[in-house]
Amino acid sequence: MVAQTLSADSGHGPLLQATEGYAARHATDAGAAFGRYNARLLAPYLISTPDKEETMSLPKHHLELLSPARDVHIAREAILHGADAVYIGGPSFGARHNACNEVSDIAQLVEFAHRYHARVFTTINTILHDNELEPARALIHQLYDAGVDALIVQDLGIMELDIPPIELHASTQTDIRTLERAKFLDQAGFSQLVLARELNLKEIRAIADETDAAIEFFIHGALCVAFSGQCNISHAQTGRSANRGDCSQACRLPYTLKDDQGRVVAFEKHLLSMKDNNQSANLSALVDAGVRSFKIEGRYKDMGYVKNITAYYRQRLDGILAERPDLARASSGRTDHFFVPDPDKTFHRGSTDYFVSDRKIDIGAFDSPTFTGLPVGTVEKVGKRDLLVVTKDPLSNGDGLNVLVKREVVGFRANIAEPKGEFEEDGEKRYRYRVEPNEMPEGLYRLRPNHPLSRNLDHNWQQALQKTSAERRVGLSWVAKLREERLELTATSEEGVTASVALDGPFGVANKPEQALDQLHDLLGQLGTTQYHADAIELDAPQAFFIPNSQLKALRREAIEALTEARVKAHPRGGRKAESNPPPVYPESHLSFLFNVYNQKARDFYHRHGVQLIDAAYEAHEETGEVPVMITKHCLRFSFNLCPKQAKGVTGVRTKVQPMQLIHGDEVLTLKFDCKPCEMHVIGKIKGHILDLPQPGSGGVNTIVGQISPEDLLKTIRKPAH
């Protein structure tokens, strides 16, 4: 056998036309669809040559679905379920301490992703201590050598390091909420900008119009109540820095809200806990506003969550692409899902589109920061060890159920869900079950008849996600040239990459010509164990010859392997974007601690761009008094109809708005309101014992916790001696 690989821009068209008559019998519409898809997708690949250094980021006409991955196994499933790119943490500096991955594992992920021309981004998005700069630089070189497509960066000191020409993306932690900030980062060398979640469509559009960088925006997942990079409450209270991936989630705790007169406005509510982001209704508007990378949050989420949410948005983006011939998918292949994606089936705290369309009063999940799921029925009767329930959907053993009792979620697992009959109510089927929990919660005994029941874990649905739940295949077309002395197979992928292999003869004339050609055609269409599907098959065979089936299969396998190798080599990897000349000047001359400058390289970067005075990051322990430990677009005055702008007839705010207080146990935080930009500042002070700890990353002994529950956080907050 002889193998030959042809590049996408080699100039080779289809090698031969199909034999007259045979082609007519086997013609399909798939070839036409292949051509239409190819025309939209192929452009960025045609400019990619081995000796031309590319700095290409996401093309302006491509839509990218970007999924999170805690580990490489989840990343692979995200790609199979339709992700055009995945973002994943490396062994360190990834802002998720419990979601680390070795470089060798990421290298294997890169090879897998590039088979679909999906991109792999690695997060280096913590702020770095001076002692960490060299380890970070070395890690970046390793990731570049592993083939990673881009780094997601928070610390701008990285821009001053000796790093390879890898594509850089500005993390949402860089706080990109103004046009001026976006333009600066664009001109400073970032290829992709992750905008603040708080922006509306008009603000997004303004940034997209004025920058060359690709615009990335969060479309689903948990919401940080603070502007990203503007939250220091975790470090102030526990010594764990959110800017370094150690957020203690103080925002999920219950608080009491008091006004300036000491009157209670809200008691023991989760007042800083946001609902989850869900932009599914706004996808078309976001496309029109210039968003090109659609990001799902969730690097701590499990496999089922990532599969479900990725599949859900894949289907919705595909719907947009079907109506927009000017746009194309950012990676290759077609995904088929073996389940019906449903965001309500996996963890969320309720849904909000936050500020994308308008400011809304109901963006908070004040009652509970946990997942209560969907209403499923009512509780009829509670016994000593079980309960009788009526549901609108069937239940299964293992389902997770819950009720809300005095603002507290009481959850339990249905160890046994025994059917007790079916009936109709208001024309709809109802199911009665005897449910025996694995452990009977005390709160259930306080329920009255017809108490609402919710299901937050559908056991059967979750089991379906544990199996193979999606398939992704790349389209290819075959051209087979059959002569007595040689059979040549050429496979061309949907991006236009080709590979040719040959089997030398001579071959004997087939006794049954028609059957022999049918056999060859069918064999080329049988790609079940590969990542491909055949869109078109052309045979050029003036005469049919006999070739053993085993040799045909071996040649087909060789062609597929050659095509895959050629496609991976043709993957259009981006590069470091050049800084503008002259370098951009930062629009501010003085940077406060809120700019998170934690090392000398970051100071050098800002000095080089015109900044004169730079305060150290909060983690440097130089801010010992009361300062904003959180800045947020979420306003509790607005949530409780206490905002002056909500008053009838008010067109502007001239009166000074009085502060309020947030109280949790012995912790008292002051709320100040900046009404012009509609922001709330949470004022607090770093605890004295934290000032005695080593600076994070300095090499001193400092306990690191990657994620902490609100309950565990309560145990870490020191109480004053009595």
Label every model-predicted segment:
Residues 1-2, 47:
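Short hydrophobic transmembrane-like helices used for membrane targeting/insertion
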Residues 154-158:
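Short, polar loop motifs at secondary-structure junctions
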Residues 98-107:
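Aromatic- and glycine-enriched glycan-recognition loops and surfaces
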Residues 4, 17-20, 54:
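Charged/polar low-complexity intrinsically disordered segments
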Residues 159-164:
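Short active-site loop/helix that positions an aromatic residue
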Residues 53-81, 85-88, 92-95, 109-110, ...:
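Surface-exposed amphipathic alpha-helical tracts and adjacent flexible/coil segments at the periphery
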Residues 11-17, 21-26, 30, 35-43, ...:
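Short, low-complexity intrinsically disordered segments enriched in A/P/G/S/L with frequent Arg
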Residues 2-10:
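Extreme N-terminal basic, low-complexity initiation segments
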